[in-house]
Amino acid sequence: VRTVLVPDTAGGQSPDGWTVPVDADGRPLAAAEHHDDLVTFVRTCEETEPPRWIWTGTASVYPAFLRGGARVRRCHDLASTRAILNVRAGIPTPPEQSVDERPGLFDVAPTADLDSVLAEFAWQRVELRGRARLELLVAAESAGTLAAAEMGFDGLPFSADTHRQVLERTLGPRPVDDGLPPRITELNTRIGAVFGRALNPASHTEVLEAFRREGIEVPSTRKRVLRELDHPAVPLLLQHRDLSKLHSTNGWHWLDTWVRDGRFRPVYVPGAVVSGRWASRGGGALQIPKALRSSVIAEPGHVFVIADAGQLEPRILAAMSGDPRMTTAAGAEDLYAPVAATTFGGDRAKAKVAVLGVLYGATSGESRALLTMLRRSFPEAVEFVERAARAGERGEVVHSWLGRACPPPDAGFFAHGDARARGRFTRNFVVQATAAEWALCVLADLRLRLAADDAGELVFFQHDEIVVHTRTPETATAHLSAAVESATRLLFGATEVRFPMQVSVRDCYGADES
């Protein structure tokens, strides 16, 4: 069952709007129906015969339903599907519209009429017809938009009090009137004293000039460059950089803006990276520093089930290439161990360097010799990524397992582009994009399993890591394992390749694994 849903507005708790059931090709099966309360209508449908909702974009439409207590199982996100199809067609992605990223506001969906939504869906169905893998990608991407909206709405359990203690311990008491924290002010003074005059330690130009006055030519203020200097200002400058980053990125203003009611509520952006990986807006959800993870604390009676897919990209390469020996190696708990045993005399470190080198295009120096050895043992796996690299060097477009296309080279590539850089990009794209698809399929499957028996909530997702907040860790872990197996079969069929998840259960995200 498919139902097109077009709100008149997504603002408020109970938007009104139109719905119409359609067939697999997007043809209406009945007359359009207007609803004064779409939230109640959607909730009723989900309790009886849940359809796949077809709407303009989850990010703008779904929040109103979440606020009204209506959650949906499946949708077809026209915006994310259009983005996938446009890249495949070589159509440049338009710049994003300005979005108010402050959390908690009642966003208003862009206006759309029912006829245009029906026409868009019908066009997309034509483009997807007969392309089973691409249809799977679109379904997974749409499911990802639902998970992203729900995780942003529900939030990640976060102790504001613990975070304030971290800030005060590290930066000193909160400054008034948005001034600098005491520790940073103190460092400014100490750095000025070392150089004999006041300067702004955050200014690249002023720091270089200060060193130059002392007869020291420094090419940049990067950490690795500064660490090579024997100068009393260096440790102070490095400390200043760390404290300034904490203050500006996750300081008191960040806490006031993004943490409410004991939850960190970021804005996740599925498919924001060309490979299909996610990004985040405003709250920096995908970049929480280690020092702040101690503030991510499960609610009473709950724990976090934290799952990380180790060695994901090498295992994806094994499954994609079908290389018999690499597939066998990827059936082991540690993929590098059998690779080391068969090719590098048991040296696991060399095996890891070789495998990662072939994935990322490290083909010079020691890596070249290791690659030659790897090619002898795993010719099909090596040829798979090298074929993608050669295509990139020729300016061609390559695709993930399910059909996500990489962007074409820019207009000047054939005249003066860096063919080798393009080749390194396409070499990794085919694997990284497929890894993103696998992780997205796991996330989509797990989301439905958790909801079916109220076994927990998804609260964090980053590339190859998933975090569930739950009262029943055993059940959540079982659902996770089932989702991994399901996603693997869905993408690769009856493969020998295993995707073992490193699972830990913790009360605090930043604590040592139990």
What are these regions (language model features)?
Residues 1-29, 118-288, 301-303, 386-390, ...:
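Conserved "right-hand" nucleotidyltransferase catalytic core of DNA-directed polymerases
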Residues 1-21, 25-35, 305, 313-317, ...:
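Hydrophobic multi-pass inner-membrane translocation pores used for secretion
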Residues 2, 12-130, 135, 311:
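Conserved DEDDh/DEDDy metal-dependent 3′-5′ exonuclease domain
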Residues 157, 309, 469-470:
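Non-catalytic interaction-recognition regions
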Residues 72-75, 458, 499-503:
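Generic structural signal for residues in well-ordered beta-strands
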Residues 197-346, 401-465, 480-488:
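Acidic, glycine-rich two-metal-ion catalytic cores of nucleic acid-processing enzymes
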Residues 78-134, 141-154, 204-205, 221-224, ...:
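Helical catalytic core of nucleic-acid polymerases
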Residues 175-176, 185-230, 362-369, 376-383, ...:
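C-terminal polymerase-core module
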